[in-house]
Design a protein with these regions (language model features):
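Short beta-strand segments within Ig-like beta-sandwich modules, predominantly Fibronectin type-III
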Residues: 27-35
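Beta-strand-rich recognition domains
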Residues: 1-21, 36, 43-97
């Protein structure tokens, strides 16, 4: 049975976020004036490791970085970063905690 957590996500970029997924669920992030997409979700079910998927579009060489926190603790191992190439950047991965 999955344990539930408070999940906070921050995606910093000047690119356009096309799709963000956690554990296979499409998650809508809100873009703020400081070019950061954010969301906080209470009681999010996770089993063992947290799977994520990020797809951004924009100008080539535009960078993005992802930060994920569980129960107010940053679990992002090394910085999760990407760079737009050929108009897009898509990254999939998982975090063990």
């Amino acid at each position: 049975m999955a344990q539930t957590y408070k999940v906070a996500v921050e995606l910093s970029t000047e690119a356009t976020l096309q799709l963000f997924k956690l554990e296979g669920y499409v998650i809508a992030l809100t873009r703020t004036l400081d070019n950061v997409y954010r969301i906080a979700i209470n009681n999010f079910p996770i089993e063992g490791e947290l799977d994520y998927y990020v797809h951004c579009t924009g100008w080539n060489k535009t960078t993005w970085s992802l930060k994920i926190s569980l129960d107010d603790k940053d679990i992002t191992p090394d910085p999760i970063r990407g760079v737009i190439e050929k108009g897009y950047s898509a990254v999939r991965g998982s975090i063990k905690f």
